[in-house]
């Protein structure tokens, strides 16, 4: 019964209001570090990069590959979600769309999301213009580009994937960033399906890939016709192991394994 409830909470895909961007289930262990990976080329004009992240599902933490998507509205930016430490557990703050980039925990997701704001491109009228110093763009296909190498210095190279708590990023939102969340729009149905599909593939589980997922990024979101390669379903053993780490807020549960691994590079 508990496993079914957890699955329903994480894999249902309603359209939440801004007040629902906070996931209510706490996890007693921290997510792994953000892996280092290569961004696939932008497939077409006006596609925006949504960086990969660690989500939680019935099988535990799993990697949601970074991917290119269209914004639900021209002029909107993506603010990534993040894990935050509160009430003796880690809680997920969902990402959202909006006219500005808000607070995403100070997490360095790479590719222009270096902890604050976004420097990988900007909207000029109805066209998104890409900063080729950061973003992987084929300029024979996409012509709205510029190059600003000065923003590369904003990359702090820290790959910790959660805010607050022991070993976490100690950033706090500005009043401007907090206001941005209030104007936020939920992830698209395409994004939700992408996340849900990744969570059903055992190869994406942190307990299986040990923080180094085989598929870190894809050009297009997972869909009914674009399934994960080498797909393997999550097992009942995976679900049972994950349930041990679902915390009850305020229960006094303490964080476990919440120090990021040293040397966040794939094994040679």
Predicted feature locations:
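Bacterial N-terminal signal peptides
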Residues: 2-12
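A short, compositionally biased domain-edge/stem linker segment
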Residues: 9, 33-36, 251
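Sec/Tat signal peptide C-region and signal peptidase I cleavage site
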Residues: 15-19
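Low-complexity, repeat-rich tail regions
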Residues: 20, 69-268
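Cleaved targeting-peptide boundary
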Residues: 20-27
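N-terminal targeting signals for Sec/Tat export/insertion, comprising classic cleavable signal peptides
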Residues: 28-50
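General zinc-binding finger modules coordinated by cysteine/histidine
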Residues: 46, 50-71, 83-84
């Amino acid at each position: 019964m508990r496993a079914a409830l957890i699955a329903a909470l994480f894999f249902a895909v309603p359209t939440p209001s801004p007040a629902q961007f906070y996931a209510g289930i706490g996890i007693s262990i921290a997510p792994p570090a953000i892996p280092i990976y290569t961004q696939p080329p932008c497939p077409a004009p006006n596609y925006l990069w949504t960086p990969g992240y660690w989500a939680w599902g019935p099988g535990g933490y799993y990697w949601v590959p970074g991917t290119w998507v269209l914004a639900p509205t021209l002029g909107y930016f993506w603010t990534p979600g993040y894990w935050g430490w509160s009430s003796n557990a880690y809680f997920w703050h969902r990402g959202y769309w909006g006219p500005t980039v808000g607070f995403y925990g100070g997490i360095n997701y790479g590719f222009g999301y270096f902890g604050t704001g976004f420097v990988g491109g900007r909207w000029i009228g109805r066209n998104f213009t890409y900063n080729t110093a950061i973003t992987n763009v084929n300029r024979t296909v996409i012509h709205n580009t510029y190059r600003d190498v000065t923003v590369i210095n904003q990359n702090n190279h820290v790959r910790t994937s959660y805010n607050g708590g022991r070993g976490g990023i100690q950033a706090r939102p500005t009043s401007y960033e907090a206001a941005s969340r209030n104007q936020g729009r939920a992830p698209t149905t395409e994004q939700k399906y992408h996340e849900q599909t990744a969570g059903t593939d055992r190869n994406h589980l942190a307990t299986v890939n040990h923080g180094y997922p085989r598929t870190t990024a894809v050009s297009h979101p997972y869909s009914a016709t674009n399934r994960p390669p080498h797909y393997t379903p999550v097992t009942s053993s995976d679900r049972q192991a994950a349930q041990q780490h679902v915390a009850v807020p305020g229960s006094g549960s303490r964080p476990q394994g919440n120090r990021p691994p040293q040397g966040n590079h794939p094994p040679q």
